Amino acid sequence: MYEGKHIHYSEVDHKPLCSYSPKLCKQRRLNGYAFCIRHVLEDRTAPFRQCEYVAKYNSQRCTNPIPKAHDRKYCNSHLQVMGVLPKKERKKKQDTIESLALNITVPSLALKTHNGLEILPPSPPPALVCLLPSDPFSFYKEEKMLKSSGAFLKKPQETLNHKQKQQDHSVDTNHLRTSSLPSTLSHSCLPPLLTGRATQTPINPSSPRAATPTVRSGSLFKTSSSLQDTHQGSKDSTDNKIKLDLNHAFDKKVVPAASGMAPCCDDTQSQLIKKCTVAMQQQAPCLKKLHRLMDQHKGRFQDLNSHLGLDWSEDSEEEDGDWKLVSYQCQRLQEKRSEESRSWAERLAGFCSYLRQKHMHLCREQRGFRRERRSQHALRKALVQAAREEPHQTAQLIQEQHQVTSAPSSTAVSLAGDDSGLCQAVVKGENCRNSALPFTRHCFQHILQNRSQQLFSSCTARFADGAQCSIPVFDITHQTPLCDEHAKKMDNFLRGDISRRTYHHHQQIQRHRPLKKAKPPALSKKHKKKGKRGTQRRPQKPIPPALPQGNLALPSILCLPSQPSGIRSPLTPDLSADEFPDDITNDISDIPHDLELNQEDFSDVLPRLPDDLQDFDLFEGKNSELLPTSEEAEELVRVLQAMGSYPESLACLSGMAELGPVEGVDCRSMPGGVVDLLSARLSAETLSSLELDPSLLHPSEDAFPPSPPSPQPPLTPPSSVGHLTDSTYTQRQPHLLAKMEDSKADLANLPLGKDEDVSHGSWGVLALPLSDSSQFHSLIASDGLLMPTGLSTPCQPSSALSALPQSSQTRSTTTSPTSQTKHLPPPPTVQALWDPSRLTAAP
């Protein structure tokens, strides 16, 4: 036998309980299994299967077991939910008599005393004695009772008195003699007190038939008179009750024996009695004896409980004992209620009295069964003797007795008279011709007309119009029986097609799937970004630079017609070709040059900005498609690190500003833009917004006088210009180094802020004629590094523009500094001196 993990026992009777493995269960085990009915499915060998009902809210299967013998897939509870079975009704309140009987009944454990002896079970009150059976052996079969009585009383002959033995002996020896009838009747049917008086009456042995009624009638009158004489002076109520009971029982038992027929007072029965008496006078002695014994047996058969002390064949003391038995039980019940604790002697005496009363009851039952056996044996012998001597008359006598016995019972007559085996149902005025079922009078179709049958029931299914199916069903296993047709329909409905079941299952899943609530975009919060995915992002185009808020009209000479990647600077860091940003000149070439932004242009943009600007990113879309890539972020960090050497760049600018006109070269022969670029000088106004020390910069009017406009001479070859620039820079290098050391100490105290911008200064509006890349050959240093337009250090324009003439500034200024400061914030640092976004391509 398979057992689970939790093996434990009951605290009451120490029997093993359910051994369900997942949790502790204190229910009783099923017979032959280690689990209760709730958890028996853990044992795979158990004849149960699991209910196939699946809950909709959690998609879990029911765990109730179903016997495999039942042809169903759902348990009773879910069949009730589905409407197949009717729901259970609440139990009605019990009747007052039943509740009273249940309250009086005491459990068996409460009947045990502390010393182990069992207290007598309390008897019901006198009001319930007539309702409850007092004798458990009253309706048992004869053979069973004989065995039980023999087991209880091994020596029954010892308990019988000597008088009873003499009576039994006289019955056994003289049962064939007709003359012994008065004596046997007097001894068997009358109480012992009256037997002596009845035997003292004169009896004529020559005429037994005439003497018998006189003796019986005389004994009857003498009995009543003797009872009146005996109890005349008694005033006890109990004695009067006993006298009435004795008279009633005596009249009931003696009159049938005297008349020789059943106890009825109808006219038909009296006529039958007269006919029988006349026939008995003309019959043979064997037939008379048979007739007498049959009457006696019939009288005993009509009394269902002939052995319960109502036969009066014993001493009168036994009747008193029977009366004391009831009073004893009531007394025991009263004592149990009044006295809870008694001594050992009292309990032992009560137990002995209980056993004595039980013994008397069993002896009385045994004597009654013995009398029944003797009477049946005598009747059989008389019947055999009469059949041998007078067979025709014996058969006629038996037939007459049978008719008399079956006359009061109409049911027995109908059953005995109709042996055709056909159905007795009447359909539309015609009798049914179908054969009846065994032991019934109806066929299968009309068996429901028999109200007394309990095996068949009507089909519980209903049609579409509400009418119930009337086909009989023999089904004792289901609570709602169905006929074959409706049972097949129910099976098809429960099983169904696989595709239909799967379809409904998916429909239920989709129906009960929780819907996502759409949140408004204004209430949606920015969630944390997930970690980097395994796939790398594609490189995206850089963010176009933000335009200044001032006048965006740029002069046409700042347009870049070609790629600016060829510009080199001595201070530009080494950048590979793939690290250069994409060309943005094509993107900004469509912007008109005379585009101006006013305050009204921002009236529609500013109200749309969120209140909390901490998490707001101007250059970030909904899907973050404009965020810079990791490569761009690393390049930006590297460029910012290279921009940390701005003091040296400023020192170079101040040193290059002291360079005069190039010797041996006529700068006026060059084009105007190149001459202005080479002869440019830094003045105090140029870097006024940087708040630098005035000692670092020379006054423009002393050291750098403006050159008057003159016709431009032809350009010098680029090679000569570059050579001259290199030689001049080499000659002035010691002086520049000295200036750089002085400027480091002075620029250490510069107030540089992150929020300042100098793009509105002279560098922002500087006119650069970039029509030809050969004009920038003079800016190329010996190291040959390139200067990109997108990402460059602020030192690049400082070193390159230090040689520009001052006259170029006067020609290129298109907007006053005061007008630009109205729209732009103060300059943050020197890092914004060189802004390539200011350069636009020429249309």
UniProtKB/Swiss-Prot annotation:
Q: Spans of biased composition, class Low complexity?
A: 796-821
Q: Where is the composition biased (Basic and acidic residues)?
A: 159-175
What keywords appear on the UniProt entry? DNA damage, DNA recombination, DNA repair, Nucleus, Transcription, Transcription regulation
In terms of superkingdom, the source organism counts as: Eukaryota
Transmembrane ranges, per UniProt, are none
Kindly list the places in or outside the cell where this protein is found, as annotated in its UniProt entry. Nucleus
Its GO biological process annotations read: DNA recombination; DNA repair
Extract one GO cellular component term from the record: nucleus
Q: Where is the composition biased (Pro residues)?
A: 705-717
Q: Where is this region: Disordered?
A: 159-216, 221-240, 503-550, 695-726, 791-843
Question: Does the record bear Transcription in its keywords?
Answer: yes
**Regions of compositional bias (Polar residues) in chain numbering:** 176-187, 197-216, 221-231
Q: Where is the composition biased (Basic residues)?
A: 503-540
Pfam families according to UniProt: zf-C3Hc3H
InterPro entries, from UniProt? Answer: Potential_DNA-bd (IPR025927)
Q: How does it assemble?
A: Component of the chromatin-remodeling INO80 complex.
Q: Which PANTHER family does the UniProt entry name for this protein?
A: INO80 COMPLEX SUBUNIT D, PTHR16198
Q: What does this protein do?
A: Putative regulatory component of the chromatin remodeling INO80 complex which is involved in transcriptional regulation, DNA replication and probably DNA repair.
Task: Describe the family membership recorded for this protein in Swiss-Prot or TrEMBL.
Answer: Belongs to the INO80D family.
- Put simply, this protein is called INO80 complex subunit D-B
